[in-house]
A protein has these predicted regions:
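Non-globular sequence segments
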Residues: 1-36, 41
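Glycine-rich beta-alpha junction loops
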Residues: 50-54, 104-106
Length: 120
């Protein structure tokens, strides 16, 4: 990958690695807390971002999700985190006021179409 900025950062890039179950549960809890904060702040709707190489999209992608656990492999497993987050969000927020942003454009090869059809 190329450098996206000519400005030097004091933060070193981290080597990608699979998340463990505890880290995944922390992430799900973080999504819940974020939605609780949005509700308290008076937001009327929320959008769960699962596109543009954000974390949830990385779990959906064959290219980035090459693990061998319950979150990898089949479409059902790769979508598991997305649905776990949605389950937690709908405990706090009305489902009809939650949108999900999906984008298959960054996937290569394109078995992603089947993934998105399954999710929707």
């Amino acid at each position: 990958m190329g450098v996206s900025s000519r400005i030097r950062s004091s933060v070193s890039p981290e080597t990608l690695r699979a998340l463990n179950q505890g880290e995944i549960q922390e992430i799900v809890s973080d999504y819940r807390k974020t939605v609780e904060n949005a509700l308290e702040a008076g937001f009327e709707k929320i959008e769960l971002h699962a596109a543009n190489d954000h974390l949830l999209q990385q779990f959906l992608a064959y290219k980035t999700n090459q693990g061998n656990d319950q979150y990898a492999g089949s479409i059902e497993n790769r979508a598991r985190l997305l649905f776990e987050v949605l389950d937690v969000l709908t405990e706090v927020w009305p489902a009809e006021r939650i949108g999900v942003r999906l984008a298959s454009g960054s996937y290569r090869p394109l078995p992603a179409v089947g993934c998105y059809i399954w999710i929707v």
